[in-house]
């Protein structure tokens, strides 16, 4: 029986952000530091950085050539101090150990690889007291319990590749649903769990109602050249 009353919140990051929790960081991953400039000379022991679980619609086997290292350095430009608990990267997400351990207590069907991350400045100085993990998703399970085609959604504006924003999810009929799940790099959680996440004071994001997320990204999509003040003003609405 479908849980008609199941509602969700979704992760929203600041538009402008703060110096200690920026929404975008010019950065490089490297497994080792073998030069004075690892930002421009990263070291990889295999091809893990180029792994994608799907290519041309076909699954790519996770061979040894694509396996994550146990640890790598995250070389960040123009960041003197890093306090964020969440950062979205093109290859996965970076989570603080505090957030990762907190999320582990909740039911989740997604599959992922994980390794430790040490953030450093371009001068190779530590920029955070927090411990971080890099999460690379192998399989996202949301299609198992959400019918995206029949969900209440709107097409995003000004996008070359068609994508959608969801006002509500059409749940498939099953007996149980996860407490949290990931849609690409975006965390979605049941209302009660999202409220617990917000109540823990994590930095760099907030869990918001789906409608609020749609409203915010519709505004951002229709304002491609915002001023800093416009961005900060929107952030004050949520953070």
What is each of the regions a protein language model found here?
Residues 4-5, 118-239:
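Acidic, proline/glycine-rich low-complexity IDRs
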Residues 58-90:
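A glycine-rich, hydrophobic loop/mini-helix early in the fold
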Residues 1-61:
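N-terminal ordered "arm"
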């Amino acid at each position: 029986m479908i849980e008609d009353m199941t509602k969700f919140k979704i992760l929203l990051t600041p538009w402008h952000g703060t110096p200690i929790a920026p929404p975008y960081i010019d950065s490089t991953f490297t497994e080792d530091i073998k030069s004075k400039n690892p930002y421009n000379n990263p070291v990889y022991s295999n091809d893990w950085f180029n792994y994608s679980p799907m290519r041309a619609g076909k699954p790519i086997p996770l061979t040894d050539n694509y396996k994550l290292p146990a640890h790598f350095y995250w070389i960040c430009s123009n960041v003197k101090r890093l306090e964020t608990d969440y950062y979205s990267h093109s290859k996965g997400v970076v989570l603080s150990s505090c957030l990762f351990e907190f999320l582990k207590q909740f039911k989740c069907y997604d599959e992922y690889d994980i390794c430790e991350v040490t953030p450093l400045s371009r001068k190779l100085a530590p920029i955070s007291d927090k411990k971080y993990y890099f999460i690379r998703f192998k399989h996202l399970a949301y299609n198992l319990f959400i019918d995206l085609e029949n969900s209440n959604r709107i097409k995003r504006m000004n996008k070359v590749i068609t994508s959608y924003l969801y006002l509500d999810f059409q749940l498939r009929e099953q007996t149980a649903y996860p407490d949290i799940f990931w849609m690409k790099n975006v965390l979605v959680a049941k209302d009660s769990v999202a409220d617990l996440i917000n109540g823990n004071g994590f930095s760099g994001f907030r869990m918001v109602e789906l409608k609020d997320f749609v409203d915010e990204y519709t505004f951002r999509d229709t304002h491609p050249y915002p001023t800093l003040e416009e961005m900060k003003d929107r952030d004050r609405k949520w953070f």
